[in-house]
């Protein structure tokens, strides 16, 4: 698997050239297939069954490649709650699962189901659906030339990231918390602030756990690797965020990230970028710390939160 990753043209900033140069955005044949699958979401209502996709052998092969890479990476870099959830709802190794197959595994565990999306979903619909146990997930597969990184969510991201989360009742309750919060918001600005909290926790969160990881390295006291878990003998934070769990490359470089202790007030003031590796991560001390921090901050989160915290719109690089 290392030879595949070594050929992946990721820049120091985490981009695969410019966004337009990524094969997932420049290969016309791939885009035709990707867009045909995405169009299945047109007119789809939350909670309706997702139509079945007849995946090609090439798409199944991409799935197998990523599954083989992530299985070991999760054992080395993922937190215990993630590993336990993955055992509760095993991910098939040999084929891309249909949404119905995923939902059948998840619903008895924590009450969640996949509902169809064609790509990025606006905040109100995406976050709000979580209150009722629905997670918007896509069905297309990332480009086969870059199987270990994708600049947009694909079915691999949704299953290996959010699908694992939603097999855990504790993580699933955090999704519902975001859903309840989103439902009481009216302004796009407030929803955007809420999406930042979601992004840096359930998408890109890490947490400190005692013990060591196979193959992990200790972060330095300055520069990359600073923050919780840094210093000689300290265990680096472990990943729980869905975007990290579905990206082999980002898992392998956790010790090179700037890691800051989780402070939700700081998180909500931090813009994020959708494509490219994240330069800054926020680390909870444990799952209880994450849960308490989110519950406390979101309890009175409303449309005036930005004004109360004196937050100004910060342009985010979401390309």
Would you name each region that the model predicts?
Residues 1-163, 279-319:
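The feature captures two recurrent sequence modes
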């Amino acid at each position: 698997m290392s030879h595949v990753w070594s050929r992946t043209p990721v820049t120091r900033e985490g981009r695969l050239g410019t966004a337009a140069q990524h094969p997932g955005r420049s290969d016309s044949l791939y885009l035709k297939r990707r867009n045909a699958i995405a169009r299945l979401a047109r007119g789809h209502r939350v909670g309706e069954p997702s139509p079945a996709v007849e995946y090609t052998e090439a798409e199944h092969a991409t799935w197998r490649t990523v599954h083989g890479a992530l299985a070991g990476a999760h054992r080395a870099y993922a937190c215990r709650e993630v590993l336990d959830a993955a055992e509760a709802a095993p991910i098939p190794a040999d084929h891309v699962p249909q949404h119905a197959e995923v939902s059948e595994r998840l619903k008895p565990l924590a009450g969640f189901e996949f509902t169809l999306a064609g790509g990025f979903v606006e905040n109100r619909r995406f976050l709000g659906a979580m209150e009722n146990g629905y997670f918007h997930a896509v069905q297309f597969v990332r480009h086969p030339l870059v199987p270990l990184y994708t600049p947009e969510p694909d079915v691999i991201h949704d299953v290996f990231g959010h699908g694992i989360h939603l097999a855990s009742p504790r993580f699933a309750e955090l999704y519902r918390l975001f859903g309840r919060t989103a439902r009481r918001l009216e302004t796009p600005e407030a929803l955007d602030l809420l999406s930042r909290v979601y992004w840096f926790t359930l998408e890109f969160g890490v947490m400190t756990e005692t013990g060591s990881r196979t193959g992990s390295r200790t972060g330095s006291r300055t520069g990359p690797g600073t923050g919780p878990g840094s210093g000689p003998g300290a265990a680096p934070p472990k990943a729980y965020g869905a975007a990290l769990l579905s990206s082999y490359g980002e898992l392998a470089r956790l010790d090179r990230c700037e890691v800051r202790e989780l402070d939700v007030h700081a998180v909500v003031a931090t813009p994020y970028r959708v494509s490219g590796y994240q330069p800054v991560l926020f680390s909870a001390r444990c799952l209880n710390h994450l849960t308490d921090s989110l519950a406390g901050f979101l309890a009175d989160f409303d449309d005036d939160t930005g004004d109360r915290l004196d937050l100004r719109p910060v342009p985010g690089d979401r390309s």
